[in-house]
């Protein structure tokens, strides 16, 4: 089992960790990149070290981590048997008849590049939408703004609930964990918003289950910049909806915990609506700078 790091900085070591479980312990676990070939005279590899339990770990040197995309697979070796992941094929990538092109990928960016939290490329983007207290009719539409701008996502809500509240959430921990230095120096939450609903709030949910939001002011050139110092602890919406329905829709914290950027797990946007009236938001990328 292995989950690749989403994004890392170029020129810095990359730690790769995997869980290898089976009836027998492997003789070795090896990392190969997409640069290897049966036809090459030399094919560099990185041996993963046993770290206890079922865990194996390796460090890819900074010299190999260049801007672009680092692609690799992991080969589990036992005797004369080889099994390559993520494909699960019982062969080695160096076998002449190995044809599987499936690889794990980690994006590699310049260390000065802003920390991306959300990029719009389709109508999904791992973005979840919810409504409290009950439900709403929702519609997503990808707006192509080429050639001058990147696409944006238009989301429309319509609820019959009295005083509905609409939520957009995206789990981002895996995407930002590979750039801890950039995360630590982030000072502003930035949103590309083409259409902003009244009362829009944006912020984060942390690993403690606490929510920190700030009100969005008018955009400058469609960009809203929120200093992280303006985030304030608030109630956490329990989404998806809590059942049975008589349960409170919110976790209401009794203890004040200061916001800590290293504890960010999810991104959240929210705004209130009016029963029977359509509400709309159109967003592009979201990042920290």
Language-model regions: role of each:
Residues 102-289:
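Beta-rich carbohydrate-recognition modules and glycan-binding surfaces
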Residues 1-126, 130-136:
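Glycan-association/targeting regions that enable binding to alpha-glucans and other polysaccharides
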